[in-house]
Amino acid sequence: MADGGKPPTPEKKSWADVEEEEEAKAKAAAAAEAASSSSSNEPAVDAQAKQIEALSLSVPEEHGGSGGGGDDQGPPLLDDSDESQIQAVTSGGTVYESAAAFEDLKLTPELLKGLHDEMGFSRPSKIQAVTLPMILTPPYKDLIAQAHNGSGKTTCFVLGMLSRVDPNRKVTQAICICPTRELAQQNKSVLMRMGKFTGITCACAIPPAQKDYVPIAKMPKITDQVVIGTSGTLMKWINHKKILTNDIKILVFDEADHMLAEDGFRSDSERIMRDIQRSAGGCQVLLFSATFNERVKDFVTRVIKDGNQIFVKKEELTLEKVKQYKVQVPDERAKIAVIKDKIFEFGQKVGQVIIFVRTKQSTKDVHNALTLEDYVCSSIQGSLDQSEREKIIQEFKNGYTKVLISTDVLARGFDQAQVNLVINYDMPIKFGTRDEPDYEVYLHRIGRAGRFGRKGAVFNLLCGETDNTVMRKIETYFQHNVPEVRNWQSEEDFERALKDAGLVE
């Protein structure tokens, strides 16, 4: 496809923004089909894989959470419960031993220095102890890995990429595909910190801001050893030969459930995978996510026919460290009243807040309603210019704003240790349905609170029978009863809820 000299028109929609009613009609049929599929999270095992041996991997007791590095109060702890049951399925005859220390993985001194000094990690988390040997032990097998938010998944694939590439070769050897620009930038930041002493460089393949636009024909070829980006931009760079794929050793899909879902980015993801596998031969493929529904699992296990698998049991995917509540309100105005008069009265004392809404218009409405009451807040959704999104994210991360209103553009992978409260202003539902919950999105949303094992609280604001139906289905699916704040007008009830969550004395 020829590249013109005009700057690209900003995308009208993002995967994370629910289309307004007239925009959604074209997707309704496909979405309804997706909604009718099973959403079980039980591990999918290929019945024909007779050589696969199921292992019950035990991790030594000293495997506490590793440091998360980064804030003034010391390294945050990972969500690394002693009760976590990791179900592993290995392919072939390789025997993997869990790693009690990063030194057990035969990493370079430069990588160990980055892990300990720059990242503040002391030892592998439970998921890292099991997963990293599978990634780093020859022969290099593909891997499907599901683990809960905050368990250390990012370190697994970032360390995998840094370990596999040769810093002396100025060619791209590792690619990581992400669903959003923000997640791509965040993963690059982690890689650059962890690999600070290795000399490895990383390019970020995301749609440029208007002011930074350069016609792709004029772009130089990418010589960074690692490229992290969104699927659309990566496809353009590969198609225009800005990235040469014949030296790729490792291909990572972060939030793989969405990257390979039919209503996500499956088309681009499959094309990138085919192109790399065709040109690079035995490229190792790593698929990481907190959730995999049954349809995605079925697709993935057909694509990855001879790989290892790691799954956390379904009942552990409820994020017990995050206290969830439901709040019955009579109307939309009452939702705003609850936020500003009840939750904010205590929420501002304990940390930052993310309010999740369903549509771009709702983002504006909630933002306007709160600013009219003199609350300082910011809002983000997919149609904003890239520079605007970056500015808003950075201001929130720096603590300049305490309240962020967002569509699901931030539901996945956004790490901000100071976020203690999440408010579901709108419950997440699947495209084209009235009351079918999007279980994966719900899990990812509540995972924004209490990152790295810290405590957090989630308030689900329910208005009418539809919201209550969605909430009941979520409780049934995750086998978790969400307690109710008895009176939406009672300050005492909200204060008691936050005390129970461990957020106020």
Swiss-Prot record:
This is DEAD-box ATP-dependent RNA helicase 38. Residues 338-493 form the Helicase C-terminal domain. Its main location: cytoplasm. InterPro entries: DEAD/DEAH_box_helicase_dom, Helicase_ATP-bd, Helicase_C-like, P-loop_NTPase, RNA_helicase_DEAD_Q_motif. A motif (DEAD box) lies at residues 254-257. It catalyses: ATP + H2O = ADP + phosphate + H(+). One of its GO terms (molecular function) is RNA helicase activity.
